[in-house]
Amino acid sequence: MQKNDDLLRERRKDEHVALGVKQNEQLAPSSLEDIQLIGTSIPRYNVKDIDLTTTIVGTNVPFPFYINAMTGGSRHTKKINAELAEIAREVAIPMAVGSQSAALKNSSLIDTYKIVREINPNGMILANISPEVALQEGLRAIEMLEADALQIHINPAQELVMQEGDRSFSHWLTRIEKYVKLSPVPVVVKEVGFGMTRETVATLASVGVQSVDLAGKGGTNFAQIENDRRRDQAYDFLLDWGISTGQALIDMQHQDAPKIAYLASGGIRNPLDIVKALALGADSVGMAGQIIYSLKKEGLTKTIEKLELWKEQLRSLFVLADAKNISELKTTPLIISGELAKWGTLREIDLVKLANRK
């Protein structure tokens, strides 16, 4: 039985990658297209003046984007993790691994994650677990990677669509609180592409969580992936569940939203998307499916070159936004239009204030 469970887990990991790559050929809207930055025609800064440094859970990093959690737990995904680690090392950006549950249950799979630290010994690496993982096992996940931080992914929609997924969730908050108190490294609680509302963030903040990844809709759709894995495809009505990245970011502009650090991910396609997310308060911006898609279609060298170009393009966008650094960018006026504006109005977000901030 254990061997069958292990094989099922490995197959699921490979299917996640294959289906995720297929999805990234044509991504769903992330609502970021409804956000417009108001720039300047007389910039105060030169490109060389721009400072892209930021912090993730208290760690200073030179660039405001990172490789988000996606994979690990099979022979095939070991190779992908190795290439992602090489990208992270060469581009000097943080990296999170995919859920380590497979390796915690089957020690023969530990190397599919550990390869990341071997290739990138000095980089910032985030371990990744579910709230289902007991504390001692979670500490093993951190040790496995000599991780600098711990991602705890919350994914009820994915679990419910997954035939072999979890069906009990009421203990998650207590488990998360325990990790926040006892983890030897900082904790980030992240969604997996269904987005966090400000109410969810407030609930997490109430138990001591100090950093979240809003992880909205628009990138890899795990409801669709799990539904595609089912023979009956019985949950096709749930494929649009959740809130988009833009909606999650706008929701955090509400006057009653908790004042904690947040990251953004989900459907990030280019440097302009990164700048929009940073302008709406994110400290850094994560990408997973798009990077793996680039790896598959363009190869390792081209993917590294693309991300290096993004750094220069980010500096150009900061100049156009008249912002020397991320702190200044967070005061840049923004126009919210289209469906996102309608959504924000119903959620009582002061869009006029956003449009006229200084």
Swiss-Prot record:
UniProt xrefs under SUPFAM superfamilies: FMN-linked oxidoreductases
Domain of life: Bacteria
Residues annotated to bind substrate: 12-13, 158
Catalytic activity: isopentenyl diphosphate = dimethylallyl diphosphate
Chief location bin: cytoplasm
Nuclease listed as a keyword: no
Function: Involved in the biosynthesis of isoprenoids. Catalyzes the 1,3-allylic rearrangement of the homoallylic substrate isopentenyl (IPP) to its allylic isomer, dimethylallyl diphosphate (DMAPP).
Protein name: Isopentenyl-diphosphate delta-isomerase
Species in which this protein is naturally found: Listeria monocytogenes serotype 4a (strain HCC23)
Lineage of origin: Bacteria, Bacillati, Bacillota, Bacilli, Bacillales
